[in-house]
Design a protein with these regions (language model features):
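Short N-terminal edge-element motif at the start of the domain
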Residues: 1-36
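Extended, compositionally biased non-globular segments
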Residues: 141-177
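Acidic carboxylate motifs that coordinate Ca2+ or other divalent cations, activating on Asp/Glu
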Residues: 40
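Exposed low-complexity, polar/acidic, P/S/T/G-rich flexible segments that act as propeptides
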Residues: 28-29, 194-216
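Low-complexity, serine/threonine/proline-enriched polar segments
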Residues: 53-156
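Extracellular structured ligand-interaction cores
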Residues: 8-10, 26-30, 45-47, 178-183, ...
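Short beta-strand-plus-loop segments that form exposed binding edges in beta-rich domains
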Residues: 186-193
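Polyanion-binding and phosphate-handling cores
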Residues: 25-28, 33, 47, 52-58
Length: 216
């Protein structure tokens, strides 16, 4: 378990975000935490979102749903969402597998639920380069104010964000007072793609209890 420490951050999550003169690469992931109330060691209690800079503002959608459908081999993966939008996760040259649809899902469609942020990606009309721009704070794989010391400024390796258990909220945005947390999950916070770079997809490499490592 990780308990609130009273320090700046309680735990850290490693991504690979970086900033550059053209905007860099930021693929924000929303963090959810759970306390094992029933003590059975399973993530079957209530999940609570950690608030970030986009919580409660115009453009952020709670209770968001997106359904993906199994494609033909080497085909784009189609989706529809709860806002009436549709699109696809496109095959690209960087990933050569036959399917981008998860191998462990036997059904021909599956639905994800969570919170969606407004995308901040854009293409430079002169150079053609795509930029995935950063959010202020509160997200994994993102060069916000909660970015911790370390990380390669060229490719983002070793980049980490710090998080506070005290930022857990109920659905209506009011704070949750958790004694400790036992489970953490990360959901990609944006449904968008940046041209030839492909879809915006949060990368997660490790989780770190800062009360043990003191690596802030």
């Amino acid at each position: 378990s990780i308990a609130p420490s009273g320090r700046e951050y309680d735990f850290a999550i490693q991504g690979n975000a970086f900033n550059s003169s053209s905007g860099g690469s930021n693929e924000p992931g929303i963090v959810w935490v759970m306390q094992d109330i029933n003590g059975n060691g399973q993530p079957d209690d209530e999940w609570y979102e950690l608030k970030g800079s986009e919580t409660g503002i115009d453009g952020t959608i709670q209770d968001y749903e997106v359904t993906y459908y199994r494609p033909a081999p080497r085909a784009h993966t189609p989706w529809v969402d709860s806002e009436g939008n549709s699109g696809s996760v496109d095959m690209n040259a960087y990933h050569g597998q036959e399917y981008y649809y998860p191998n462990w899902i036997k059904e021909d469609s599956y639905t994800l639920y969570g919170t969606r942020l407004t995308p901040r990606n854009n293409q430079d009309p002169v150079t053609g380069y795509w930029a995935n721009n950063a959010y202020e704070w509160g997200y994994v794989d993102n060069m916000g104010s909660d970015n911790l010391v370390g990380g390669n400024v060229i490719d983002g390796s070793g980049q980490r964000n710090g998080f506070k258990i005290a930022n857990a909220i109920y659905h209506d945005g009011t704070p949750v007072k958790l004694q400790y947390i036992d489970f953490i999950k990360v959901q990609c916070g944006v449904l968008s793609k940046s041209g030839w770079l492909g879809e915006i997809s949060t990368e997660v490499f490790s989780f770190e209890d800062l009360s043990i490592t003191n690596n802030q």
